[in-house]
Design a protein with these regions (language model features):
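Thiol-/selenol-based redox modules, centered on thioredoxin-like
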Residues: 161-225
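Loop/turn elements at helix/coil->beta-strand transitions in domains of secreted/extracellular proteins
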Residues: 61-63, 90-93, 135-137
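Conserved redox-active cysteine motifs that mediate thiol-disulfide chemistry
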Residues: 68-85, 99
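Short pre-active-site segment immediately N-terminal to redox-active cysteine/selenocysteine motifs
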Residues: 62-64, 68-72, 101, 155
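N-terminal targeting signals for export/organelle localization
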Residues: 1-44, 199-225
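Short, internal strand/loop/helix patches
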Residues: 112-165
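Hydrophobic beta-strand anchors of alpha/beta hydrolase catalytic cores
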Residues: 65-66, 94, 159
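A short beta-strand-turn-helix
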Residues: 43-65
Length: 225
């Protein structure tokens, strides 16, 4: 009886260790996002060009990419030429999320006001896009990273594909490649465009609760990562 009393906790502990070990060894890129087939978190953020605030609601009715990027991100430089070529070739709208552009080291000499942060973030981003090309119809500034957190951003860059009804249908962690765009993104874009023409919703119970009784359409707020 005493042996059994100690054996059960030991077995449970070993099972827990095994599961933790498997989880730690898994590549985060291979872990599916729980946000797939759910409504993309809404937000309002200032645009890079200072045209006001942008909300994803402005793109309801369109299939589009949401790309998380930053000037300090080394992998973003690897990915960027691919996005520039893709934007010119395919015509799929890309909205960039400039993620945590202001780093802690920027405030070593003292805290910065929100206006100062926006000004510095815009200046850096404009210079970077001028040098490397601008694939975005617009970019928004997520200075504190809260929107990134709501989208489950694991690292930079990340890319999301959002359908005409504002649902996340695909997520890619890390730099996208021409192969990813050709073999994964574009086939899904074509599928979603066809799906939109039949006015069907993603088949999940949560989505059924969220789906409006009639399709909604919002014109982009602005003249159009």
């Amino acid at each position: 009886l005493i042996q059994k009393k100690f054996l059960i906790p030991l077995v449970l502990f070993l099972v827990l260790v095994v599961f933790l070990g498997v989880g730690l060894r898994r590549d985060p890129k291979e872990i599916p996002s729980p946000l797939i087939n759910t409504a993309a978190p809404d937000f309002e953020l200032p645009t890079l060009k200072g045209e006001g605030n942008f909300s994803p609601k402005a793109y309801l009715g369109r299939v589009w990419l949401f790309n998380v990027w930053a000037t300090w991100c080394v992998s973003c430089r690897e990915e960027h030429p691919v996005l520039v070529a893709f934007a010119k070739r395919e015509g799929v709208p890309i909205v960039g999320l400039s993620y945590k552009e202001i780093q802690p080291s920027d405030e070593d000499k003292g805290p910065m006001s929100l206006e100062s942060k926006l000004s510095l973030a815009r200046a850096r981003s404009f210079e970077w896009l001028k040098k490397h090309g601008d694939p975005y119809q617009l970019s928004v500034l997520d200075l504190d990273g809260r929107v990134g957190i709501n989208y489950g951003v694991y690292g930079v860059p990340e890319t999301y594909l959002i359908d005409t009804k504002g649902f996340i249908r695909y997520k890619h962690i890390g730099p996208v490649t021409p192969e990813v765009l050709a073999q994964e993104v574009m086939p899904l874009v074509h599928e979603l465009q066809k799906e939109a023409s039949t006015n069907s919703w993603p088949n999940t119970s949560r989505n059924a609760e969220l789906a409006p009784s009639t399709p909604q359409s919002f014109a982009p707020s602005y003249a159009l990562k």
